[in-house]
């Protein structure tokens, strides 16, 4: 069952627990420098406090629907069950392809193909963007 969450992407690495007093699922880039990346930090949360961070170098703020393609939903994983290393990639909007068609292709064609080809994956999550408050016009984010 899809779960709606806020997803914020930042130009710099974040410590959102310290910034908001709440625990969020935060993925920070390990590359140094990070200016060649589309973003350096992805923060997922159900808390509206995440919206307040949008003034602090936020690249984009999105409402996303999480689909767990491989493994349990992120909220169900203990800290020890989270992957030690995560690849995060934006799904760039293809000109002429609306969001609904792109999501159908991602869910029904690309997702199953990725699971078949990348047999060593332990986690695969599709974060479909259902609303963009601001930021790049992506169709989604993928966590591998």
Task: State where each predicted segment sits.
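Macromolecular interaction modules
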Residues: 1-144
């Amino acid at each position: 069952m899809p779960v709606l969450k806020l997803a914020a992407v930042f130009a710099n690495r974040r410590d959102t627990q310290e910034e908001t007093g709440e625990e969020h699922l935060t993925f920070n880039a390990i590359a140094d420098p990070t200016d060649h990346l589309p973003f350096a930090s992805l923060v997922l949360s159900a808390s509206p406090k995440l919206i307040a961070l949008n003034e602090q170098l936020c690249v984009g703020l999105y409402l996303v629907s999480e689909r767990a393609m491989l493994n349990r939903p992120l909220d169900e994983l203990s800290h020890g069950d989270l992957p030690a290393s995560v690849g995060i990639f934006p799904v760039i909007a293809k000109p002429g392809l609306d969001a609904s068609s792109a999501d159908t292709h991602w869910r029904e064609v690309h997702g199953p193909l990725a699971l078949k080809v990348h047999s060593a994956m332990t986690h695969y999550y599709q974060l479909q963007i259902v609303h963009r408050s601001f930021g790049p016009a992506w169709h989604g984010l993928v966590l591998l």
